[in-house]
Every structure is written in C-alpha cells, then in structure tokens.
Amino acid sequence: LGQDWVEDTASFGTVTIGCARLQACVHHLERSFAERPLRKTAQSGNFLVAVPEGAQHTLGAVVLAAQLRQAGAVVKLVLDASAEHMSKRVKSEQFQAVLISASIGQNIESLRQFVQASRDRENQSNVIVGGSLLSVQSDLNARVGADAATNKWQEAIKLGLRGLPCRQVAL
C-alpha cells in the first residue's frame, strides 16, 4: 500500500480506505491478544503515544500502541492532539515516556512546540520521537528537543523505561 502510494499507482482514496482497514485489523488483533497471556518477557511501563494535530498519518502510531500493549505496557493513544491538550495531559497523568509520531512534511517548529508541551513539569517523562520524518531528519531529536528518536518499538520501551537526560533544543 505504501509502495503503491510512493510510486503513484494508488489513489488517495484507495490508500485512505486501505489504511482504515489496516487499523481495523490492528484493533481486531488487539482484542484477540487480550484473551491470551502476555509474552513471558513482558515489559512494564506507562506510555503515551501521540499524533500531533493535523497529521494525516496515524497507522504507525496505532500499530506502535498495539505492539507496546502486547509487550505488557500500559498505553494511552491520542490522535490529532494539540500542544495544549498534551500539556494538560502530562500534567494530569504520569507517563514514563511520551512517544510522538512525526511524519514527513510535518513542520519542525510546530513539532518542537509539541515536544515542549509534552514534557511534564518535572521533566520526568522521556519524550521520544519516531515516524517517517526520521528517514529524512537524522538529527530530529536534537532539532525538536526530544530525548531520543527511534522507529523501533523495542528500543522505545528501553529508552522510555530508563532515565534519559533532557536535551536542550539545538537552534
């Protein structure tokens, strides 16, 4: 589906419907996972997975949330979240990590503001960015002020569960 989009052999409608169906499949699989015990190597942790307001790409975040849950983590997923919503959310709930989806085409400055709003007052939550934007921005975490950047869910768990020093935004 993604390759067809890149090669311009699939219409916007086809890709949108295909992604919606894939998300429905993920939700169906999550229900069946809930009926089975977690893996023996289950990870604990409390994560917030967020897709910034206006982003059109949500499938990766939905899949990430499902993978984290299957690994034993407690996960909250917010789609189309504003910076204001994130600021309120991290002040009212404690998360070990906030995982932010960053898509190609996303404005770096607005993403930096979103990352900043996603920090709790005490900077105890690690803020980790991932997504397609990493393929074109190797220094993304430094540019937006995140603690780390990865597209590997296993690495996100490890980074989220250990204390990372908060980095200053590189201007």
Show which residues each predicted segment covers.
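Long amphipathic alpha-helical segments
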Residues: L1-E35
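Long amphipathic alpha-helical segments with strong coiled-coil/leucine-zipper propensity
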Residues: F33-P37, V49, Q56-H57
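Short, flexible hinge/linker loops that cap or flank conserved catalytic cores
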Residues: K40-Q43, R121
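Conserved hydrophobic helix-helix packing surfaces used for dimerization/oligomerization
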Residues: N46-F47, V98
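Short, charged N-terminal beta->alpha structural module
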Residues: P52-R69
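Cofactor-cradling patches in redox/metallo enzymes
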Residues: Q67, K76-V78, S82-L140
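Peripheral docking tails and interdomain loops at the edges
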Residues: L133-S135, D139-L171
